[in-house]
């Protein structure tokens, strides 16, 4: 296969490896949250994509992605995911927040908005607790988190697998 043919896919493989490293670093940051007060949902399907982390807790709901290098399209993706989740929480009184974690990012968190008016917080190492407290939302109580965990666990029986109705389909 000619090098020119493989360069495009090689760049995507390298970018995916960077996203994997960033997500692992964010997993460590999220791991410092108090599990009694925060529900951390991994790889939630929102807005047509898999979102690495969705946090439900006392300071609100936050949809988080992670990348070593972010783009304005990434801002749109996490915003679309947050908007999708907002549709599932019609009585929730606060906005669903969105953010992109960039490991090694220097400086304070910043709120970015693109030309489509999609927005997200960009933040780096050790800023997650500050960012969550910054929102000031009255989010989920510990009792709400316990109830949400129980409802989620009851939604799909343990060990069940949903298979396509016809072999070879989707």
Residues of each region from the PLM?
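Active-site beta-strand-loop-beta-strand hairpin of nuclease catalytic cores
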Residues: 54-66
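Surface-exposed interaction regions that form or flank ligand-binding interfaces
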Residues: 1-49, 59, 68-170
